[in-house]
Amino acid sequence: MTLNLCVLTPNRIVWDSEVKEIILSTNSGQIGVLANHAPIATAVDIGILKIRLANQWLTMALMGGFARIGNNEITILVNDAEKNSDIDPQEAQQTLEIAEANLRKAEGKRQTIEANLALRRARTRVEALNTI
């Protein structure tokens, strides 16, 4: 049995195809979804989406949003998403280093929160390259 997975951002459809299984980062931890999963709506955290096709796993960096699962349909709406194959390793590493530097020099609560979020996004992109 398969699931139909659709990953959407405000600007584009990132993925729309059948899959065997996914592992999704939610605000309360990771969940695995197979065919005939119980219906659920959940917040999606900044993190990795693992997608299993027949015998192959793919990864995607997700930048927060929400997901709806039901009737073997998974719709994930996120602020941004990148397949690991679309991420430039050098650019991702450079962005991570900049985010770490910005966090070190952040002043005040607002700057610190924004710098932490940027760092989480940068780490997720690097992690997507190194997962599976």
Swiss-Prot record:
The keyword Membrane applies. GO terms for molecular function: ATP binding; mRNA binding; proton-transporting ATP synthase activity, rotational mechanism. One of its GO terms (cellular component) is chloroplast thylakoid membrane. Its main location: plastid. The modification N-acetylthreonine is found at T2. Keywords: Acetylation, ATP synthesis, CF(1), Chloroplast, Hydrogen ion transport, Ion transport, Membrane, Plastid, Thylakoid, Transport. Gene3D superfamilies: 6.10.140.480, F0F1 ATP synthase delta/epsilon subunit, N-terminal (2.60.15.10). The keyword Acetylation applies. F-type ATPases have 2 components, CF(1) - the catalytic core - and CF(0) - the membrane proton channel. CF(1) has five subunits: alpha(3), beta(3), gamma(1), delta(1), epsilon(1). CF(0) has three main subunits: a, b and c. Belongs to the ATPase epsilon chain family. Produces ATP from ADP in the presence of a proton gradient across the membrane. PANTHER family: ATP SYNTHASE DELTA/EPSILON CHAIN (PTHR13822), ATP SYNTHASE EPSILON CHAIN, CHLOROPLASTIC (PTHR13822:SF10). This is ATP synthase epsilon chain, chloroplastic. It comes from Arabidopsis thaliana. The lineage of its organism: Eukaryota, Viridiplantae, Streptophyta, Embryophyta, Tracheophyta. The gene is atpE.
